[in-house]
Regions:
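Non-catalytic DNA-binding core/recognition domains of DNA-processing enzymes
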Residues: 1-8, 22, 130
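Basic, Lys/Arg- and aromatic-enriched nucleic-acid-binding interface segment
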Residues: 10, 14-16, 20-94, 133-134, ...
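Short, polar N-cap/turn motifs at the start of nucleic acid-interacting alpha helices
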Residues: 99-105, 188, 207-228
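C-terminal secondary-structure termini that scaffold catalytic or DNA-interacting sites
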Residues: 44-69, 115-127, 132-134, 140-152, ...
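C-terminal catalytic core of tyrosine-transesterase DNA break-rejoin enzymes
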Residues: 72, 81, 85-92, 172, ...
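Conserved tyrosine-mediated DNA breakage-rejoining catalytic core shared by Y-recombinases
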Residues: 20-24, 30-33, 86, 95-144, ...
């Protein structure tokens, strides 16, 4: 539009360019994400914490404090694994239930916004396929706590206690992740950066539409606007193909 108006002024079709001095919208800054090495560092540390908490229960009566420590460590591990696998928003992670998982397919239908349970940010449900390791971890954590209880156990994936009677808030998950990240030695840990890592990885692989679907964006333009920095520039194969077509006379 700016170029067209400048041309009109040059051709004396307009006296002046109405957009002169008007600045266009700022280009979104690249979303900061946790690199794959950092994610692996987080997973490794979380796994060690689960092993350490489990070791304290061997050979002694399990005290409530020891059990809470083990449950918290397991929740840390699941949080990193599921967030890095699904690309879900923190408000979506907070209200996931075991019943949302069908085989390896996770249905993301709910979200928390300012502490209020409702639909997802895009108001659209979506389904994502999880890695087999993530699914096995979810079932293991539920099965290991499913001993006879006075009351039935709830099915929230992230909960304050092993009873799983209520979900954790999105802020609580963010705090939990930040504390874990600092303990693991990760610089500036933030839960939403795992989501950005999923998007960046997929866009770098040329899978823009799959990134859009996994993140729950309404359209690909949203994904491209925020992650255009990750679009691969390796188009050598395209150049070679066009070169062959042009030379094939």
């Amino acid at each position: 539009l700016r170029s067209a108006l400048s041309w009109a002024v040059a051709e004396e079709l307009l006296r002046s360019n109405p957009l002169a001095g008007v600045r266009g919208p700022a280009r979104p800054q690249p979303r900061r994400h946790h690199a794959l090495a950092e994610v692996r560092q987080l997973l490794g540390y979380a796994e060690q914490e689960v092993e350490r908490a489990s070791a304290f229960l061997v050979g002694e009566r399990a005290s409530p404090r020891r059990l809470r420590s083990l449950f918290s460590a397991e929740q840390d591990l699941l949080l990193v694994r599921l967030a890095a696998d699904s690309g879900a928003r923190r408000g979506e992670l907070a209200v996931l239930r075991l019943g949302d998982l069908d085989g390896r397919v996770l249905s993301i239908e709910r979200g928390l916004s300012h502490g209020v349970l409702g639909s997802t940010k895009s108001s659209r449900a979506r389904r994502v396929t999880l890695g087999a390791t993530t699914v096995a971890l979810i079932h293991h954590q539920f099965d290991s706590w499913a001993e006879p209880r006075p009351t039935p156990m709830g099915d929230w994936l992230f909960a304050p206690t092993p009873a799983r009677e209520t979900f954790m808030t999105a802020d609580a998950l963010s705090h939990k992740f930040r504390r874990l990240g600092r303990s693991a030695g990760v610089e500036n840990p933030a839960l939403h950066r795992l989501r950005h890592g999923v998007a960046t990885h997929l866009v770098e692989k040329g899978k823009l539409l799959k990134a859009q679907a996994r993140l729950g964006h309404r359209d690909p333009s949203t994904t491209l606007r925020h992650y255009s920095h990750a679009v691969p520039l390796d188009d050598l194969d395209v150049a070679d193909e066009l070169d062959q077509v042009l030379n094939d006379r």
